[in-house]
Regions:
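Bacterial N-terminal signal peptides
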Residues: 1-4
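Cleavable N-terminal signal peptides
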Residues: 9-10
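Conserved SGNH/GDSL esterase-like catalytic core that processes O-acyl groups on lipids
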Residues: 18-22, 30-128, 133
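Active-site-proximal beta-strand/loop segments in catalytic clefts of secreted hydrolases
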Residues: 24-27, 58-63, 112-117, 167-171, ...
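Catalytic His-Asp segment of secreted/periplasmic serine-dependent ester chemistry enzymes
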Residues: 34, 73, 169-248
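Sec-exported extracytoplasmic/periplasmic mature domains
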Residues: 47, 51, 115, 153-160, ...
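Active-site segments of SGNH/GDSL-like serine hydrolases
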Residues: 113-117, 149-184
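Serine-dependent acyl-ester chemistry module
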Residues: 117-142, 170-182
Length: 248
């Protein structure tokens, strides 16, 4: 069991305890398991420290915010690697379907934590930093900004009572710092324009890429995915940031 840092219990109690939480994202969330009980994932520590009523995981390893030119929405398909159809928009559609059909409770809080694969595999998303109305499959934007806006719009329209939080990727060794910063800046810009809280993990989070290089990374197992200590630090950071915003 990891000790609480000062202020964590209060922040969690104010904004997360007893709430239903939905999780959308990539492997950084997925590695905690569907039951949020695997120690190397931040969700396991978040569950123990914040005590939400429920946590439903829609995240998939390999997922990106950004749609590819050939992205199709297929809620029946399952991918846990980088794939044109492994995108956050599809996860959001699954969540909406589950809530509308009564499979899941309407979440009080939706945490959307992704962007690592957008930075790492930007070449696989050719429209990532383009502007304008480029679309995939005739309807989905193929830019990062457009993709973030589309996901948030879908959730806001169908789950208007759910609070959304966008979380930028943590620093990592798998992609240049400039790529992580650029992806994070786009997510931040869209979130701010929509009035949605953004947690800048790349800038303010506990993971420092310089400390993760070499033979003995401190908070990750491979320069990107957290080890149990890193997962606990990340969970504490998220709880503090969520609580701080709630008190403003």
């Amino acid at each position: 069991m990891f000790a609480l840092l000062p202020g964590v219990a209060g922040a969690a109690g104010n904004s997360v305890t007893g709430k239903n939480v939905a999780l959308i994202g990539d492997s950084m969330t997925w590695i905690g398991g569907d039951s949020c009980d695997i120690a190397r994932g931040w969700t396991s520590h978040f569950r123990l420290l914040a005590s939400p009523a429920s946590m439903n995981v829609y995240a998939r390893s390999g997922a990106t915010w950004t749609n590819a030119p050939d992205t199709k929405v297929d809620t029946e398909a399952f991918y846990d690697v980088l794939h044109d159809d492994n995108v956050l928009y599809t996860q959001a559609v699954r969540l909406v379907i589950d809530v509308c059909s009564g499979v899941s409770r309407c979440p009080d809080l939706i945490i959307l934590y992704a962007g690592a694969n957008d930075a790492w595999f930007a070449s696989r998303r050719p429209g990532i930093f383009t502007a304008g109305s480029t679309t995939a499959d005739g309807s989905l934007p193929a830019s990062l900004a457009g993709s973030v806006r589309a996901v948030c719009g879908l959730l806001r329209e169908n789950l208007p009572d759910s609070r959304m939080i966008l979380v930028t990727p943590a620093q990592m060794t798998k992609a240049p710092a400039s790529a992580v910063e650029r992806v994070s800046a786009v997510i931040d810009s869209v979130g701010c324009s929509l009035g949605i809280q953004v947690i800048r993990t790349d800038r303010d989070g506990p993971i420092n890429a310089a400390e993760e290089r070499g033979r003995h990374p401190r908070l990750t197992s491979d320069g990107i995915h957290t080890n149990p200590e890193g997962a606990a630090e990340l969970a504490r950071f998220f709880i503090r940031e969520i609580g701080r915003y709630s008190e403003e």
